[in-house]
Amino acid sequence: MPFIPHTEEDVAEMLTSIGARSIDELFDEIPAELKTGKLTQVPPGLSEMEISRLMYERAQQDGFYLSFIGAGAYEHHIPAAVWQITTRGEFYSSYTPYQAEASQGTLQLLYEYQTMMASLAGMDVSNASLYDGASALAEAALMAVRQHRTSRRILVPQTVHPVYRSVMRTIVRNQAIEVVEVPYDPATGQVAIDKLDQFAQEEFAALIIPQPNFFGVLEQVDALTDWAHDKQSLAVAVVNPTSLAMLKPPGEWGRRGADIAVGEGQPLGIPLSSGGPYFGFMTCKQELVRQMPGRIIGRTTDLEGKEGFALTLQAREQHIRRSKATSNICTNQGLMVTAATIYMSLLGPEGLYRVAAHSHANTVALVEQLEKLPGVKKAFHSPFFHEAALQLSVPADKVLNRLKAQGVLGGVLLENHYPDLKNTLLVCATETKTAEDLDKYTEVLRQALAASA
């Protein structure tokens, strides 16, 4: 369709129709000091050759660091075939598959993704993705409130990722939903189940259950799930998809299983690239499918009896009345889902298990080595997956700076989110780390501790 700009006559007719004298009058409520015709902070334009050289020079400034940072974004090996296939034009440049007869490849891929995620989580249904793990948790909270009907309160343990909690509060704040936090046990790093008793006589739409939690610790998911169901609340799982290849899936937690399972899909073939783009996943039980946000791909047969795939449930504001929509999720993260589907297909169940097992083994080995250093001890005495919190006897921020100077990113400073966890690092070692990497971390930490004493 060609673009035809408005003529002066068009503009004059529209202004007369709305009773305005000029286009500027439409924006007169904007303070004059905020109006500008120039972008003063933007440099002048560059040619392709100039910008290529500039980016090359900037890239040379980047150093290589051995990273032991996790906290929600994880460094995993991604087979070269994943993005070689993902960036094919059929996937890379395609838009939302509204026209089913012309988009069978994309629709089948999304259907396979849903099947894999539902299987991985032990749930009945998966949608075609959400924006990221944090917004997926917020959507789960909204979904739980819609399903519960009588309560607009959500119980959220402090062991849930602090950024997830912040995003959830932001999204639900203007919908009259109250978020109530549950403290953690300082000895175990788990949800303090005994502290849940104070809420025994109160009504909540859902209890959020992280597995593993932000500290890397494994929660008592069976007891927490049963507690929620005994109180007529929904159990909402927040999980690391890599861990599901090794741990009990949410659908098998407790007597009845979790009702909803969400999480961040980045570990499934998405690279660490300045924080995104990632994608969120959501799975649930069949009885909740009508409350699920986003879109679902279904398998059907056409008039000739041939198998095909189509967009089935699309309870979003672009398709139905805004007041009836479950979410404003838009084109979402289809390309990221493409990469995740290819990643899971290439690795298969055995490959995913090996990634999880190797990551766990590496973190166990690293923690055992580091605990032998004077001034290092585990912050919590509980089982963990592939992250662990370590408490130092010296200022942890200075230690991290010394490690970085030696080419090692030593972890996340937990006191930034948990003021009571002074000088405590959250460290992670995935399958990408070798024995030599673990030894290097141990040695540079030993030197940093000695220099900081």
Curated annotation (Swiss-Prot):
InterPro entries the UniProt entry points to: GcvPA, GDC-P_N, GDC_P, PyrdxlP-dep_Trfase, PyrdxlP-dep_Trfase_major, PyrdxlP-dep_Trfase_small
One GO process term, biological-process aspect: nucleoside metabolic process
UniProt key word Oxidoreductase: yes
Annotated catalysed reactions: N(6)-[(R)-lipoyl]-L-lysyl-[glycine-cleavage complex H protein] + glycine + H(+) = N(6)-[(R)-S(8)-aminomethyldihydrolipoyl]-L-lysyl-[glycine-cleavage complex H protein] + CO2
GO terms, molecular function: glycine dehydrogenase (decarboxylating) activity
Enzymatic class: oxidoreductase
EC number(s) stated in the UniProt entry for this protein: 1.4.4.2
Keywords assigned by UniProt, alphabetized: Oxidoreductase
Parts forming coiled coils: none
Pfam family of the protein (one): GDC-P
Family: Belongs to the GcvP family. N-terminal subunit subfamily.
Known function: The glycine cleavage system catalyzes the degradation of glycine. The P protein binds the alpha-amino group of glycine through its pyridoxal phosphate cofactor; CO(2) is released and the remaining methylamine moiety is then transferred to the lipoamide cofactor of the H protein.
Record text on subunit structure and interactions: The glycine cleavage system is composed of four proteins: P, T, L and H. In this organism, the P 'protein' is a heterodimer of two subunits.
NCBIfam families: PRK00451.1
Record PANTHER family: GLYCINE CLEAVAGE SYSTEM P-PROTEIN, GLYCINE DEHYDROGENASE (DECARBOXYLATING)
This protein's name: Probable glycine dehydrogenase (decarboxylating) subunit 1
Species for this entry: Nitrosomonas europaea (strain ATCC 19718 / CIP 103999 / KCTC 2705 / NBRC 14298)
